[in-house]
Amino acid sequence: MNDMCSARSGRLGMVLTDIIKSYWSLALFLVWMAVGVFPLSCYENDSMHLLAGCSVMANQGVTVPPPYSYFYDMQPLVSYVVVGLNAVFAWLTCEQLYCLVTWFAACFAVVGTVRFCRRLTLLPVHVLVFALLFLPESYACAMYPNSAVPAYACFVWAMCMVLDGRFVLAVALMGLAPLFRIDVVIVYPVLLPLLLFVYGRKKVWRCVALSAVAAVAVVAMVTVGCAAMGADPVRHTLGMYSSFDVGGQYSGQVKYALFTFYTIVSVVVLPLGVVVLWRRRSLLLLVTCLLPMLLLHYMFRRTGCAGKHWLYILPFVLMLCSTGWAAIAHWCNGRRGARYAVAALVVLYAFCSVRITIPPAVAKVSKAWVGNERQEGPFLTLFSEDLTPMKCRFGIGAGQFIPTADEMMIASGNVFYPFYIHAYKSNKDAMRREAKAYADTLPCYDIAALAWGDRIWYQNLLLDDGYAMTGKNDDGYVLRKGGSTVDCYYVHDDIPKGDAAAAYRTLKPLKRPGRPLLVVPETDARAYVMDKLVALGKAVRHARRCYEVR
């Protein structure tokens, strides 16, 4: 009996040892990623609008659809998940819960991505995790609440279930993912080549039939789910994407999103992975990788303005990049000089950075605010120059800020990215709480929103305090709690960025006798305008992001 127990203990110890050896790098990656998750604060203004609807339902009762949201038809399920969790964990705000949901989903997504890619490439876990470091969206997506992450987590685990032969569970997850975010279906055609991995190329028609069954089942689940939640993604979401595609208002930002998704390192390594798979005649794996990538690139060619839009192709990009890295490592064997050169380049990119200052003379007056509070995070300057207007600095730490439509990304120094985001979120959250500390001294006041982000960024703190939203229309809404009322006005005028005179002409008529008119700008651009009004004596600044119009 003792010998049997000893044998079992020995086998358990061997299993645990193998798990630790295989997955220590993945565990370290998840812990490192968690630094940027905190504080549990949203820095992206679109998600702030969705959160406002969650808070309104938490305070005033659940409705279908929510009384306030952001592109609800595209992402209906996430609102009710957050509100449901708030009913259970009432001591947490909807904003904190949405951050936690995104973080947990990102952790599951990373684990699923590594599991999926390891199954198809047979590469060690540490190689896959190393390649993830140079695909920043794999961890950046965890650091601000967004619906793409739970949708992606469901999708990647559905693909894992396909490889495991658990077809029913895979289809269930594929039906759940679009309810979190509908655009995940763009990459669903990858199911067919994955089924060929499972059943073999001799059973093509069986794979085609299973793909058709999955498609019908997914359409049925999404139709029923959206109908139950009062969402219509076909009519509203497809029309939205079509208008964005035709209008091209986001097309100029696509290149920044792609640069931050792939990074300059992966752009070099990924083609190498394609060549390696081609030479190995791993054509099915190559098709599996390239098919969803081509589909998503085509669909988002003018609208993929943030890294999260490209998140769904992460496992396929990772397989190509990790294959390229493995080929580089193999080539460096026995070549000491090459090994040191590659290691030096990797360390330089991952740990070192160049930062530049963008002065008004270079950025023009419309972008004079660029580079102030976005140069956050740890940065140790090793040397700098003052001879050029850019005032370049080279050092160790988070690199130059790269603007995307939704996310705060950096050009290099990715090892420090979680610390960069932690510092940025802490500072931004502190600014709106400073504004609230002053506004709480006023019984009643008005707020004017000069930009999209200003409409709800600060006001979410009031909703967290139990304020009720009433009278919402195209011009604003009213927040009430007891005897306190806050009237929120939307400014529809297209005020040129940096034009303080135009801003004041718009704000002045909104000021009512006996009621302070506050502006709490979420964006650097509007804060810059308000600072100019302070200098002109037409506004008073009570906190870093709290201004009162005179």
Predicted features by range, described:
Residues 117, 348-478:
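Membrane-embedded, lumen/periplasm-facing catalytic core of multi-pass transferases
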